[in-house]
Amino acid sequence: MAFQIPRGTQDILPGEVEKWQYVEKIARDICKRYNYHEIRTPIFEHTELFLRGVGDTTDIVQKEMYTFEDRAGRSMTLRPEGTAPVVRSFVENKMYGNPNQPIKLYYIGPMFRYERPQAGRFRQFVQFGVEAIGSNDPAIDAEVIAMAMELYRSLGLKKLRLVINSLGDVETRKAHRQALIDHFKSRIHELCEDCQVRLEKNPLRILDCKKDRDHELMATAPSILDYLNDESRHYFEKVKAYLTKLGIPFEVDPRLVRGLDYYHHTTFEIMSDAEGFGAITTLCGGGRYSGLVQEIGGPETPGIGFALSIERLLAALEAEGITLPISEGIDCYVVAVGEKAKDESILLVHKLRKAGIVADKDYQDRKIKAQLKSADRLNAKFVAILGDDELAKEVINIKEMSTGEQTEVPLHSVVDYLKERLS
C-alpha cells in the first residue's frame, strides 16, 4: 500500500523549508527587538479550554476542531489557535504575579482545523502569534500592530492594507447587541441558518458571516462606532493617534468584529491587495481582550495579540513576486581520490564543520569526475581535492568553483585558508 499525506496537509521539502526558516528567523528577530519572549505550549489541550477560550458558538469550536478521547476518557483537542493555550499557561504558571507587566510572549507552531482545504488554508498550518498580557495602555495596541506590519514590510511586502475597528467596552457591546437584534430580527429568515442561530446567541457574529456579507441588511446594520461611550471613543482615538505617529496608515471598518464577549476595544486585520492572491485576503488578525484571563481561571487581566499563518504569508510573497534571500549551496566539498585520502577526508570534513564551514563529501565511492559533478550540483563555493599523493606531501588542492582557480595549500592550514577566503 502506498501511503499519502492526509488531505489538507503538506510536506515541506528541502529547498522550500529554507523559506520557512528565513521567515521564522525574521519573526523571532523582531520579537527580540520588541522584548517578546517565546513560549511553547502542548499541541493538544483539554477540550474545555477551547470551549471557554474560543467560544462554543464559533465555527472553530462547532465545525473545525480535531477532538478525541484519550485512553482515560478525557476529551482532548488539537489546538486550533494559539491564544487560549498561551493564556492558560499565563494563568497556570501565575505569570500575573510577575511585577514586569505586561508579559510579552510569542509562539510559532502547528495548529489544526478541520476545514475545506483551499488556497491559503490547510488543516494543519503554522501560526505565528504574539500576546501582550497585563496592560490597558492603548500604546501597547499600537505596538502589537506595528510588530505585525514590521514583519510584512521587512520581508518586502508592499500591497498591504491595515483595517481597524473598536468594539468598545461592555456597555458599548450591550447597547450594540440590542440594536443588532432589533435590526435583523424581522428579516432574519432571509439570512443563512448560522446567522439565524447567532441572532440570539451572538448577534455581533452575523456581521462576520461569509455567506451573507453582500445582503442589504449587512450594509444597513447599526455601526458599533455609533455606540461607543466617551471612554471607549477616547481609547480608540488614542490608538489611531499612535498609529499615525508611527507612520502606519489604516482604514476604519465598523464591520470588522470579533464575536467573543471578552474582545473589547481594538480589533484589526492586515489584508493583501496583491493581484492573484486569491479570495482569502486576510493575512493577520488580532484584537484586545478583557475577560479571557478570568474565563480561564485567572484574575482580571487585559491583553492584546495577533496571529498569522506562515503559509498565507508565503503565498502573499509569491503573489507580489518577492524572492527571499535564501543562501543556497555549501562552502566546501571534499573530493577524495585513493583509499588513504578517503579515510583522511572524514577527519578533514569534521574539522571544517567544527570551524563553522558548511562542508560535505562523497559517500558513494565515486570517481573524481562524478564527485566534482556532485560539488557543482550542491553549489559548492570551493572544492578541496585530496589524493594519496597530496596526502603524502601534506598538501591539498583548493578549487574556487566560480573562477576555476586552483591553489595548493598546506593540509594543516586548509581550515584557516578557507575561513579567510569565505569571509
Swiss-Prot record:
Q: Which organism is it from?
A: Geobacillus sp. (strain WCH70)
> PANTHER family, alphabetically?
HISTIDINE--TRNA LIGASE, MITOCHONDRIAL-RELATED, HISTIDYL-TRNA SYNTHETASE
Q: Which reaction does it catalyse?
A: tRNA(His) + L-histidine + ATP = L-histidyl-tRNA(His) + AMP + diphosphate + H(+)
Please give the Pfam families that the UniProt record associates with this protein: HGTP_anticodon, tRNA-synt_His
Q: Which domain of life is it from?
A: Bacteria
Mention any one GO cellular component term assigned to this protein in its UniProt record. cytoplasm
**Keywords tagged on the record:** Aminoacyl-tRNA synthetase, ATP-binding, Cytoplasm, Ligase, Nucleotide-binding, Protein biosynthesis
For this entry, list what GO says about its biological process.
histidyl-tRNA aminoacylation
GO MF terms listed in the record are: ATP binding; catalytic activity, acting on a protein; histidine-tRNA ligase activity; transferase activity
Q: What is its main location?
A: cytoplasm
Query: Into which EC class is this enzyme placed?
Result: ligase
Q: Does the keyword Repressor apply?
A: no
Q: Where in the cell is it found?
A: Cytoplasm
List, alphabetically, the Gene3D superfamilies matched: Anticodon-binding domain, Bira Bifunctional Protein, Domain 2
Tell me its EC number(s), please.
6.1.1.21
SUPFAM superfamilies assigned to the protein according to its UniProt record, in alphabetical order: Class II aaRS ABD-related (SSF52954), Class II aaRS and biotin synthetases (SSF55681)
Describe the family membership recorded for this protein in Swiss-Prot or TrEMBL: Belongs to the class-II aminoacyl-tRNA synthetase family.
Protein name according to UniProt: Histidine--tRNA ligase
Record keyword Flavoprotein present: no
Question: PROSITE patterns, per this entry?
Answer: AA_TRNA_LIGASE_II
* Subunit-structure text: Homodimer.
